[in-house]
Curated annotation (Swiss-Prot):
Keyword Cytoplasm listed: yes
PROSITE patterns: P_GLUCOSE_ISOMERASE_1, P_GLUCOSE_ISOMERASE_3
PANTHER family: GLUCOSE-6-PHOSPHATE ISOMERASE (PTHR11469:SF1)
Pathway annotation from the record: Carbohydrate biosynthesis; gluconeogenesis; Carbohydrate degradation; glycolysis; D-glyceraldehyde 3-phosphate and glycerone phosphate from D-glucose: step 2/4
Protein's name according to its UniProt entry: Glucose-6-phosphate isomerase
Organism annotation: Clostridium botulinum (strain Loch Maree / Type A3)
GO cellular component, one term: cytosol
GO molecular function, one term: monosaccharide binding
UniProt catalytic activity: alpha-D-glucose 6-phosphate = beta-D-fructose 6-phosphate
Length: 450
């Protein structure tokens, strides 16, 4: 086993002391047992727990074969999905690939350009994307459990027409891959009738926990990332975080500290990175925790920040604003690439004190200085150390945060595996759009909006 993630809690003191962590150990162990025995709320959606060792090997092989077909056939790969249907794959691709992978020549990239659609309803975004890709060879992966989620359904209708006009129905079906329910739903019906290759979203894995299913694995594999290594990282994390000893289990310690802080009025957690390629990992994490914990009038509000960039916008608030914040820093110990700062004889910028130092060294000192400054200002800091950004450690990070999320939700007394609140805006939107069956509601809403 490679080196694992490690947790540094020294800068959560004096806000949380060790005896408070120990006090929560038995409760956390009980919540973990509830997860393992599948006796708690939402227990029909716990397939993610054993997924790293219990995935469908035949389908996994088909994913790798389809990814090779996509790489060999297409200039552009369009991933259509919203929420958990795209955030995980985008987080992995952006974390591990070249920062500017879409701008590289294909001879350097060796994989298609990858663009994401169906995660908004912006006509400008869609028109610009169509303009960009219309003259290129295109493959599409549409990801939806039901096939009727508004944003991806609209996007797929548009791209399906584009591909059929460009390649004919027979040609289009060779370039469309559908990830959907095993047996039911509009997308399953369409995929079966059109003859698309399909991959299954497991019934027992919710969308925000689905990155290690075909939902995430096909786009990730098509980007050239080693999904075997990713599953290995998740499997090793599953084994490591099976310990019921809070001294050894970093998931337990993370859950204990964040919940102890929450009980003391620290109601906002900021996931902070110092690597721009982790931006979408923060977006994935926000959905994971926001949908899992935010219900019944409770929950830690998940925010994410990209430092040092956001220190020049949010830094003032974090340092001296309302004291309801704590931070979780992702500290990448070894960067993918290094670049040295050279000496300048004139030294007009006064930076020669950094000459012959690596930019990553400067970045790490910025992280260390920020942790200390924010701690002095009343903001506790959890530091999660990650040896490197690779497929293996992406798998580790995913499992770490997913397991912590499940335990933490139970600790807060909520069902972390449902999301009833997301239906409210949809009902209003459908009524305002005139969807059949919503006529009475439409009139009421229009009156309220006057």
């Amino acid at each position: 086993m490679k080196n694992s993630l490690s947790l540094d809690l020294t800068k959560t003191k004096p806000y949380v002391e060790e005896h408070e962590i120990q006090y929560l150990e038995s409760i956390i162990r009980e919540m973990d047992n509830t997860l393992g025995k599948k006796t708690g709320p939402g227990n029909k959606f716990l397939g993610w727990m054993d997924l790293p060792i219990n995935y469908n090997k035949e389908e996994f092989a088909r994913i790798k074969k389809a990814a090779e077909k996509i790489k060999n056939t297409c200039d552009v790969f369009i991933v259509i999905g919203i929420g958990g249907s795209y955030l995980g794959s985008r987080a992995a691709i952006e974390m591990i690939s070249n920062t500017f992978y879409n701008n590289l020549d294909k001879s350097q990239r060796k994989v298609p350009q990858i663009y994401f659609a169906g995660n908004n309803i912006s006509s400008t975004y869609m028109a610009d994307l169509l303009e960009l890709v219309k003259d290129k060879d295109i493959c599409v992966n549409v990801i939806s459990k039901s096939g009727t989620t508004t944003e991806p359904a609209i996007a797929f209708r548009i791209f399906k027409e584009l591909l059929e006009n460009k390649y004919g129905k027979e040609g289009a079906k060779e370039r469309i891959f559908a990830t959907t329910d095993a047996a039911k739903g509009a997308l399953r019906t369409l995929a079966d009738s059109e003859g698309y290759e399909t991959f299954v979203i497991p019934d027992d894995v919710g969308g925000r926990f689905s990155v290690l299913t075909p939902v995430g694995l096909l786009p990730i594999a098509a980007s050239g990332i080693d999904i075997d290594e990713m599953m290995k990282g998740a499997a090793d994390a599953r084994q490591e975080y099976s310990s019921d000893n809070i001294e050894k289990n970093h998931v337990y310690r993370y859950v204990a500290v964040r919940n102890a802080l929450y009980r003391k009025g620290k109601t906002t957690e900021m996931l902070v990175n110092f690597e721009p390629c982790l931006h979408y990992f923060g977006e994935w994490w926000k959905q994971l925790y926001g949908e899992s914990e935010g219900k019944d009038g409770k929950g830690i509000f998940p925010a994410a920040a990209d430092f040092s960039t956001d220190l020049h916008s949010m830094g003032q608030y974090i340092q001296e604003g309302l004291r309801n914040i704590f931070e979780t820093f992702i500290n990448v110990e070894n960067p993918r690439k290094s670049i040295m700062i050279k000496e300048d004889k004139e030294n007009l910028d006064g930076l020669n004190f950094l000459a012959e130092k690596d930019m990553d060294y400067v970045n790490h000192q910025a992280l260390r200085g920020t942790v200390l400054a924010h701690n002095d200002g009343g903001v506790p800091a959890i530091v999660l150390n990650v040896p490197e950004l690779s497929a293996y450690y992406f798998g580790q990070l995913v499992y770490f945060f997913e397991k912590a999320c499940g335990i933490s939700g139970y600790l807060q007394g909520v069902n972390p595996f449902d999301q009833p609140g997301v239906e409210a805006y949809k009902k209003n939107m459908f009524a305002l759009l005139g969807k059949p069956g919503h006529e009475d509601m439409k009139a009421t809403l229009e009156e309220r909006l006057k």
